[in-house]
Regions:
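Contiguous alpha-helical segments
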Residues: 165-170
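Short, non-ligating residues that shape and space the ligands of small metal-coordination modules
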Residues: 143, 159, 163
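Short helix-coil boundary/hinge micro-motifs
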Residues: 1-143
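Cysteine-rich micro-motifs
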Residues: 148-158
Length: 170
């Protein structure tokens, strides 16, 4: 079975990149490759700068918790970074792309990130993208849990918060 590459993996990757922005083009490419992105084109400093600019806009989506303004912010990213859907079989099986084949590395990523975020929020819930609820943590996470009740970026933050609540009661 073929899995849609615009789903949970891109929104998880873009959250990771937003939490710890890549400092070099090489780091961006390596982190994308480690996340399973097929790298079939060169990347340069312009791509890194464009991804950083996209992340600034994506953070507006993250930090907007009211559903309608959140959707409007994401729609702006989609309009700027994603193209009309089209079928392609460039890698041996038919699937949908939301971009032209000849786009830059950054445009490949930003299309994948904007569409992936849209699919994540429509399939799992408009509220399933947030910042960690732990004290002094601002990490972003995409809630991919079954019940949709994730409030911490990691088990470590969850445990620290539980200890903090316990000590506050003592």
């Amino acid at each position: 079975m073929y899995i849609n590459p615009y789903g949970a993996d891109p929104v998880t990757l873009v959250a990771d990149l937003a939490n710890s922005r890549p400092r070099t083009t090489r780091e961006l490419v390596d982190r994308c490759r480690e996340a399973g992105v097929t790298i079939d084109r060169d990347a340069d400093e312009n791509d890194l700068a464009e991804v950083h600019d996209f992340l600034d806009g994506w953070l507006v989506v993250v930090d907007t918790t009211d559903p309608r303004p959140r959707a409007e912010a994401l729609n702006s990213l989609l309009a700027e970074h994603a193209g009309p859907p089209r079928l392609t079989d460039h890698d041996g099986h038919w699937h949908v792309h939301y971009r032209a084949d000849d786009v830059t590395f950054a445009r490949l990523l930003t299309a994948m990130f904007s569409v992936g975020t849209a699919l994540h929020l429509t399939e799992r819930g408009i509220d399933r993208l947030a910042r960690c609820a732990a004290h002094n943590c601002t990490q972003i996470f995409a809630d991919t849990t079954r019940n949709g009740r994730k409030t911490y970026c990691s088990p470590r933050c969850n445990n620290r918060s539980a200890v903090r609540r316990h000590r506050a009661r003592a």
